[in-house]
Amino acid sequence: MVLLRVLILLLSWAAGLGGQYGNPLNKYIRHYEGLSYDVDSLHQKHQRAKRAVSHEDQFLRLNFHAHGRHFNLRMKRDTSLFSDEFRVETSNKVLDYDTSHIYTGHIYGEEGSFSHGSVIDGRFEGFIQTHGGTFYIEPAERYIKDRTLPFHSVIYHEDDINYPHKYGPQGGCADHSVFERMRKYQMTGVEEVTQTPQEKHANNGPELLRKKRTTSAEKNTCQLYIQTDHLFFKYYGTREAVIAQISSHVKAIDTIYQTTDFSGIRNISFMVKRIRINTTADEKDPTNPFRFPNIGVEKFLELNSEQNHDDYCLAYVFTDRDFDDGVLGLAWVGAPSGSSGGICEKSKLYSDGKKKSLNTGIITVQNYGSHVPPKVSHITFAHEVGHNFGSPHDSGTECTPGESKNLGQKENGNYIMYARATSGDKLNNNKFSLCSIRNISQVLEKKRNNCFVESGQPICGNGMVEQGEQCDCGYSDQCKDECCYDANQPEGKKCRLKPEKECSPSQGPCCTAQCKFKSKTEKCRDDSDCAKEGICNGITALCPASDPKPNFTDCNRHTQVCINGQCAGSICEKYGLEECTCASSDGKDDKELCHVCCMKKMEPLTCASTGSEKWKKHFLGRTITLQPGSPCNDFRGYCDVFMRCRLVDADGPLARLKKAIFSPELYENIAEWIVAYWWAVLLMGIALIMLMAGFIKICSVHTPSSNPKLPPPKPLPGTLKRRRPPQTIQPPQRQRPRESYQMGHMRR
């Protein structure tokens, strides 16, 4: 008994530690690790970066180890997300807000990596894109409350996000009936009869306008107005955290849209022009349209649309509300012509007599009582903006591969504009389908010149080597680089390599301070579970991609194997087997439900635990268990820390009752039974008629009637009581009460 208690305490302690594999963070995040770097040191670096005294201080460096690899972040203040006119409005105050806590950067020496986030009170929050996928970092107290922890932040990989509603009947966007009502309403907009000089010019000389467009800078940036309600502020706590969340969402969709070719229209980007933060103090403000706690998703979008948003490309409201049917967002769908709504739409009068701006949308970060991971919220934002850009939901086999019966296509998942929310871990989840690209390109061709602005060009002097630059060491008072011309030099010379210089340290870690490429033997990146250490190649300043370790090398604490440099294969593949799910059946030990199980290829009947006698020659009797939080029993439950499969009822009792009552199969079965047993139905009908006749006959004596020939109705209580024989009423004999009682008793 004592040993059992000690074991339980040890398991509970292990479950609470960060950095241990198999820690589920919530029902959507299956595994996380804790981070406990020095927050005071990072805060001091952040303060130095704000002042930017030297070239080195411009960059914020953060180093830590997690998920079996080293992160060496090199970041710089991100000003690309906010326009020159950016303002923050809160509680009737307009502020010229300092966004110096927003950073963007990369992993030093890892080509193609990218990071974005914020530094608040010495803690970094954001996402890091690597060759092995995207990692997310958030404050620990956002998930783990009322506990003393040895770490202050949590980090998890996108593959560990398990969003159960991604292919379910609920979750994500509104259903078809809602969009149909919205579409009909959009058709009722009354167009303004006045014509702007630009439109007159377009009508009088389209060829001239087309020529001017080709010679001038392209308008490809959509400016945003973002509002947050008091519930969103209540969840994140501070103004800095709210702006960090907005920045993270905008950067996420900016990355998706910039890398998409919309039929020749490229580099579509986003920039925040204005933010309105409704704090908890605004909850009682009568001028705050979002103050009420119980607002449906359609009404919430309508409240946003009732404001005038003519100065913006799009206007969104972020909230923390649990809308019905798992809706995460809603937006008006744009069209090239014939309908109002979408990007650049101006305020106009509609059939209900109200003026509205239909260049709007809403986003919530809560779903079915839990807060969704940032990855899901980012994809939702990209999805709703896709509606504004003119794309309806994907349909048809070409654009919904996740519904395909072909396993190869199904494995790639659905695209961004799929009707239901996705977890973002599939190949297609961050891409637009061909259907969406065709629709969006038509709307962009018609509308983007009405409100889009020119995008910011690469800036020489920001310390980051961008397109068109050979190097970038900053301005003259910051540049300590002997290899690169600083930003104060004339055009054609600044941000270029000096004569006879091979490289610049600003290009990457494989360049020396003497402007020479490092030799082929120098290390530029530490090794990981599945990749060898990075070695300079002697011909470039960037750290080349690391050579992968041999396929089927054990990784992830011997639970997986390396495939082409990524820890992505099952341990079963090492022995020519396939991973399978141990499902419960007669005679099967329920403990095996949380074991890693393998089977021979294309032979499901051979599925057995790694600890079984069948696979003893491969695993030597060693049982490999699934990680806590992993699905088990054919996805009908999840494994807890005690390696027990806990069954999950995803629908709930009310949903099951509704399905049982209104199921078409139920009525089909009843109809078949009636046809087969018609004589039983006839007997039941006769019995029911006789029962009703008897009931009427019995109750008729208690029913009042206006017929004077019928006896008066009998009272029902008197009928139900036990009757006694009638007695002659005599005056009470006070002197002999006991005798009267005895006589009555005898009569009975």
Swiss-Prot record:
One of its GO terms (molecular function) is protein homodimerization activity. It is an enzyme of class 3 (hydrolase). Binds 1 zinc ion per subunit. Glycans are attached at N439. The chain crosses the membrane at residues 673-693. It catalyses: Endopeptidase of broad specificity. Its main location: membrane. The precursor is cleaved by furin and PCSK7. Residues 19-213 form a propeptide. Residues 1-18 form the signal peptide. A motif (SH3-binding) lies at residues 708-715, 722-728. Zn(2+) binds at C173, H383, H387, H393. A motif (Cysteine switch) lies at residues 171-178. Its EC number is 3.4.24.81. Induction: Up-regulared in chondrocytes culture by interleukin-1 and reduced by retinoic acid. Residues 220-456 form the Peptidase M12B domain. Keywords: Cell junction, Cell membrane, Cell projection, Cleavage on pair of basic residues, Cytoplasm, Cytoplasmic vesicle, Disulfide bond, Glycoprotein, Golgi apparatus, Hydrolase, Membrane, Metal-binding, Metalloprotease, Notch signaling pathway, Phosphoprotein, Protease, SH3-binding, Signal, Transmembrane, Transmembrane helix, Zinc, Zymogen. Residues 704-748 are annotated as: Disordered. SUPFAM superfamilies: Blood coagulation inhibitor (disintegrin), Metalloproteases ('zincins'), catalytic domain. The record marks R213, T214 as: Cleavage. The keyword ATP-binding does not apply. The active site is at E384. CDD domains: ZnMc_TACE_like. The keyword Membrane applies. Transmembrane metalloprotease which mediates the ectodomain shedding of a myriad of transmembrane proteins, including adhesion proteins, growth factor precursors and cytokines being essential for development and tissue homeostasis. Associates with six members of the tetraspanin superfamily TspanC8 which regulate its exit from the endoplasmic reticulum and its substrate selectivity. Cleaves the membrane-bound precursor of TNF-alpha at '76-Ala-|-Val-77' to its mature soluble form. Responsible for the proteolytical release of soluble JAM3 from endothelial cells surface. This is Disintegrin and metalloproteinase domain-containing protein 10. It comes from Sus scrofa (Pig). The gene is ADAM10.
